[in-house]
């Protein structure tokens, strides 16, 4: 269950500085209800099972890359890593992510940092014509698949085509330690749509840095 922020708590987030924009919890945080216009929201929030699925899926993929078992790339394979942290769930990151997901506006919010660190973000959306929604794993797999366009010979983030690989690189950013996600499932024009927002701390995707230290 997600608890509405008190006015004071939301106000604290208004003091957090980002490179641009007002903090998502300052803007929208006093209501945890979806704000989706004509979209029929069926579920908002992440269940415990889904939370475990998200964390496990991330860590399995991070370990696969860290061990040098990811053969895809442009060119592949991806080199093994020596500093791949094991991600743990963070409720504060999740609360910020859920608040943004609740706006049903596909894309990135402008300001999501915490007092502890700068926060990165991945977003995914998928629609099906059936009566079910794409699973968390299915959405996360879309981020993993971007590895096919990543060139490990260009060591830093900035040398790669960010728009094609940015979700992958945040997923396997070695120094990132925590993750928290928000989710909205809704129906619009008979399409069952699942919108996922994941926040990561400390953030990855610094242009001048390697995505992880190589073995």
Swiss-Prot record:
It comes from Dolichovespula maculata. This is Venom allergen 5.02. The lineage of its organism: Eukaryota, Metazoa, Ecdysozoa, Arthropoda, Hexapoda. Keywords: Allergen, Disulfide bond, Secreted, Signal. It holds the Pfam family CAP. Residues 1-10 form the signal peptide. InterPro entries: Allrgn_V5/Tpx1_CS (IPR018244), CAP_dom (IPR014044), CAP_sf (IPR035940), CRISP-related (IPR001283), V5_allergen-like (IPR002413). Residues 55-200 form the SCP domain. Disulfide bonds join 14-26, 18-111, 36-104, 181-198.
């Amino acid at each position: 269950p997600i608890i509405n922020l008190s006015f004071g708590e939301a106000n604290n987030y208004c003091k957090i500085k980002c490179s641009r924009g007002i903090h998502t919890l300052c803007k929208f945080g006093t209501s945890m209800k979806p704000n989706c216009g004509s979209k029929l929201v069926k579920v908002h929030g992440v269940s415990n099972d889904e939370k475990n699925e998200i964390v496990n899926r991330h860590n399995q993929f991070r370990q696969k890359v860290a061990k040098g078992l990811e053969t895809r790339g442009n060119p592949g394979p991806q080199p093994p890593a020596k500093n791949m942290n094991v991600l743990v769930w963070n409720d504060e990151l999740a609360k910020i992510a859920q608040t943004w997901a609740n706006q049903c506006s596909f894309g990135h919010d402008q300001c999501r940092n915490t007092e502890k660190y700068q926060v990165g973000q991945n977003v995914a959306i998928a629609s099906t014509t059936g009566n079910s929604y794409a699973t968390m794993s299915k959405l996360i797999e879309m981020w993993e698949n971007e590895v096919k366009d990543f060139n490990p010979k260009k060591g830093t983030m900035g040398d790669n085509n960010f728009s094609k690989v940015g979700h992958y690189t945040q997923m396997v950013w070695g120094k990132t330690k925590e993750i928290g996600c928000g989710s909205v499932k809704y129906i619009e024009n008979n399409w069952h749509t699942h919108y996922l927002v994941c926040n990561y701390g400390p953030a990855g995707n610094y242009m001048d840095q390697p995505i992880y230290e190589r073995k």
